[in-house]
């Protein structure tokens, strides 16, 4: 098998890539989980705020019964398979204005967010002003002051040089950014059984490598950002952020992600109590 790589949006934005994967015009793509939701709304469960308590929950959500559950949704509803997952850290909050240490500090600030109904609702629940802006335009929007901040993990923050226009980061653990490696179901059906096994195993190996890379390089990127002058703060009141997000966003987005039964099926798959 020969694999050709087309990085940096050469094949269009993520929505276009997902459409091409579904149509069989593109074999594999790595996309942000939020961009899969218009095609498989139950995958939006992964973006519900404070779904995960820690990295153990994140790993359980992307392996074993939980992965099988989500992959089944993707195959039946989306026309693609989830070969594996890439891990890009919590969506920590950065801004250019001031340190954010409590819920009151974020009120009124404008944040770039992806086109995600759940993230939009989450920031509104905290009293911030979320603005959907494409990823390609994020740096310019920050540089020109169109928004005060954004949300992403340390490796991406450093690679995109956001530290040139953002001086404050707050470690808020409300959502973990996952990017599934999706494979066209049409392409998969054309493969021999041996090739299907080979590519499935390769996806699992890539996922394990990505997790190990993230755990090590995320720490290094954090330190490099501190050395570059970025101030990193922890919240004084994350329980209040959690309460605001869960009490407002979960009921509002229940139907959007497939209903309470789907949410509780996923919670059961990662060993959590049902949402009542």
Predicted regions and their residues:
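N-terminal secretory/targeting leader peptides
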Residues: 1-57, 65-66, 72-276
């Amino acid at each position: 098998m020969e694999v050709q790589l087309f990085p940096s949006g050469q094949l269009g934005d993520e929505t276009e890539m997902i459409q091409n994967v579904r149509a069989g015009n593109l074999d594999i793509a790595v996309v942000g989980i939020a961009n899969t939701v218009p095609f498989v709304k139950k995958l939006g469960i992964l973006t519900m705020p404070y779904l995960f308590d820690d990295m153990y929950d994140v790993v359980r959500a992307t392996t074993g019964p939980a992965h099988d559950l989500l992959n089944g949704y993707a195959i039946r509803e989306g026309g693609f398979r989830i070969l594996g997952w890439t891990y890009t850290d919590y969506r920590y909050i950065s801004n250019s204005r001031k340190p954010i240490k409590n819920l009151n500090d974020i009120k009124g600030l404008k944040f770039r967010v992806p086109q995600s109904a759940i993230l939009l609702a989450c920031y509104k629940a905290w009293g911030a002003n979320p603005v959907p802006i494409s990823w390609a335009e994020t740096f310019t929007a920050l540089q020109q002051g169109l928004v005060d901040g954004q949300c992403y993990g340390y490796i991406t923050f450093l690679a995109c040089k956001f530290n040139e226009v953002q001086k404050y980061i707050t470690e808020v653990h409300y959502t973990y950014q996952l990017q599934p490696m999706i494979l066209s179901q049409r392409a998969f059906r054309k493969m021999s059984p041996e090739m299907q096994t080979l590519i499935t195993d390769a996806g699992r190996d890539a996922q394990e490598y990505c997790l190990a890379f993230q755990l090590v390089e995320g720490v290094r990127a954090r330190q490099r950002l501190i050395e570059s002058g970025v101030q990193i703060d922890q919240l004084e009141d994350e329980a209040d952020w959690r309460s605001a997000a869960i009490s407002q966003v979960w009921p509002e987005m229940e139907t959007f992600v497939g209903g309470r039964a789907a949410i509780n099926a996923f919670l059961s798959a990662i060993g959590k109590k049902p949402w009542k």
